[in-house]
């Protein structure tokens, strides 16, 4: 219990940091709203606003028309959120890096915050470095680099998250250390991971924590904590945002699933590209029930595979965390199924199942481990493809999952009905209830798949109502062709080629997509999922 309390405390810090990363006015707006709610004679209205804040992780909501609008008195968020100066655009960054190539590594680091070189910013960073000597010790040369920067508001520089968020990360480390001390004898591997990850938060180098996380034997509890995913960076698509997930392992389901993970090399070798790699015959796959999620992880997140770092994955592998009480939740699945049934012809409506969703999701996560990891010239995909990197990587993983399905059927992982359910969920995944915004990589790549599938005859309008028919006999051929294109883009690392590909397949026709979206809106009971946790205050 002591360890859990400490881990939850660390998670709350990740939540606050994430909200701070998203919007500079978020925390003040939340505090004001809390005070209004406490003082309200009739708290229903403020309670509704608190629910909105909780659902959208800040003071900006997504409307039913997919617009982003503040619902508290705050400004609109910047594309780069608070990780870049307000008003900074990509051309200015590109120009700056062309004239200051030595700044490239720090400006483009996934865990750095970009600032303008004002006297106030530089003085504040140096003062914080004085206040947190532990950060200075873990970042040799940082002080000298900051002192060497000339004051120039037109110039840019970057500081590590460890300095920008030193007070919060120092406190989070203390909580992780205390949790580790409480479980040292019971689960030494988990304790070692917590010690390492606490240090990682302040060093910015996650290798020690990643290594002990992926290779350790933890027992019942697991914790994902730190800054990994960059989906919220709509400027460059490279900055990582904070999250935490406290998870309880379902041992029986985990063992059954691990026994099935035996054909990874065969699945890798079957992918439609020439540059195959050796993959580990076993990767840690765990089925968990979510105890609490924080920050970017909060919501109906079904699964995760980490670490993202290609070098860490090569050396230590990756860990897959399946969130069973989200993925297998009957109410959530029923809402998903309603969307599918609203747009497919009657004879296809029973093809979707919870098991099909589970398997497609599982192999999507494993798909991140397979295929291209770095470009032909050795660059990371994030560096090469920038704001398109997440979109292309997520599409690759969707397609790897579908491409693997026939192999899974051949080895007896599931039967013909299981294969069909896996495929049906692949179509369900592409359905959109509104037109995606340009900064929504998940929804955009789903729409692109739908359009490719439609143009290549995998799905087509059926009957007078123009409901969708699924041509299962075309499935593997069409998926293979699209996956081949995606792998080619990743290997080439060509930004302009990738942009042309996205522009080609990212389109919306109200007569087709709009009509299907209307059918979904008419049938779906809910447009969002508000996830609450029994162990938390949930506001």
Feature-to-residue mapping (PLM):
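Short, glycine/acidic-rich hinge or "gate" loops at secondary-structure transitions
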Residues: 188-195, 278, 379-381, 410-425
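Long, well-structured alpha-helical subdomains associated
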Residues: 402-498
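Extended, compositionally biased alpha-helical segments that mediate assembly or anchoring
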Residues: 487-539
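N-terminal helix-rich structural modules
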Residues: 1-185, 189-193
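An active-site-proximal "capping" alpha-helix that borders the catalytic cofactor pocket
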Residues: 187, 390-407
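Contiguous, non-catalytic segments that form substrate-binding/exosite surfaces or channel walls
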Residues: 158-349, 353
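Active-site recognition of the HExxH zinc-binding catalytic motif
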Residues: 356-373, 397, 402
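Post-HEXXH active-site segment of zinc metalloproteases
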Residues: 372-395
């Amino acid at each position: 219990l002591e360890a859990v309390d400490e881990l939850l405390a660390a998670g709350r810090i990740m939540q606050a940091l994430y909200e701070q990363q998203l919007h500079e006015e978020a925390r003040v707006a939340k505090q004001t709203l809390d005070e209004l709610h406490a003082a309200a004679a009739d708290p229903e209205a403020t309670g509704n606003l608190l629910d909105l804040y909780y659902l959208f992780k800040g003071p900006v909501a997504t409307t039913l028309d997919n617009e982003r609008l503040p619902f508290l008195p705050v400004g609109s968020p910047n594309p780069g959120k608070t990780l870049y100066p307000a008003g900074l655009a990509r051309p200015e960054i590109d120009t700056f890096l062309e004239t200051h190539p030595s700044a490239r590594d720090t400006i483009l680091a996934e865990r750095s915050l970009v600032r303008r070189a004002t006297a106030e910013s530089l003085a504040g960073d140096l003062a914080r470095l004085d206040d947190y000597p532990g950060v200075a010790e873990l970042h040799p040369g940082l002080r000298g680099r900051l002192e060497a920067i000339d004051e120039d508001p037109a110039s840019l520089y970057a500081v590590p998250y460890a300095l920008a968020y030193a007070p919060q990360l120092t406190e989070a480390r203390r909580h992780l250390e205390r949790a580790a001390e409480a479980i040292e004898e019971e689960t030494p591997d988990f304790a070692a991971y917590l010690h390492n990850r606490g240090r990682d938060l302040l060093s910015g180098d996650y290798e020690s924590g990643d290594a002990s996380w992926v290779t350790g034997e933890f027992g019942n509890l697991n914790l994902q904590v730190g800054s990994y995913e960059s989906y919220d960076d709509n400027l460059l698509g490279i900055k990582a945002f904070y999250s935490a997930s406290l998870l309880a392992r379902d041992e029986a389901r985990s063992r059954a699933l691990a026994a099935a993970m035996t054909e990874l090399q065969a699945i890798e070798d079957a992918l439609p590209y020439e540059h195959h790699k050796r993959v580990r015959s076993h990767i840690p796959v765990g089925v968990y029930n979510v105890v609490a999620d924080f920050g970017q992880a909060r919501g109906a997140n079904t699964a995760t595979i980490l670490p993202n770092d290609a070098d860490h994955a090569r050396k230590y592998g990756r860990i897959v965390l399946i969130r069973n009480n989200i993925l297998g939740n009957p109410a959530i699945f029923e809402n998903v199924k309603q969307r599918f049934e609203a747009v497919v012809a009657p004879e296809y409506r029973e093809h979707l199942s919870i098991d099909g969703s589970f398997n497609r999701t599982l192999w999507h996560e494993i798909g991140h481990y397979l295929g291209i990891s770095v470009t032909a010239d050795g660059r990371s995909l994030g560096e090469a493809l920038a704001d398109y990197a997440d979109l292309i990587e997520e599409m690759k993983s969707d397609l790897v999952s579908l491409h693997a399905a026939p192999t899974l059927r051949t080895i007896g992982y599931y039967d013909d009905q299981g294969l069909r359910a896996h495929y049906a969920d692949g179509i369900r995944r592409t359905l959109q209830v509104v037109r995606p915004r340009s900064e929504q990589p998940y929804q955009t790549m789903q729409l692109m798949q739908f359009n490719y599938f439609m143009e290549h005859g995998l799905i087509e309008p059926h009957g007078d109502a123009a409901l969708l028919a699924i041509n299962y006999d075309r499935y593997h051929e069409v998926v293979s062709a699209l996956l081949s294109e995606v792998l080619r883009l990743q290997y080439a690392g060509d930004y302009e080629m990738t942009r042309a590909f996205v522009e080609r397949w990212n389109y919306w026709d109200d007569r087709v997509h709009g009509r299907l979206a209307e059918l979904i809106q008419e049938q779906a009971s809910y447009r969002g999922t508000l996830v609450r946790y029994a162990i938390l205050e949930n506001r």
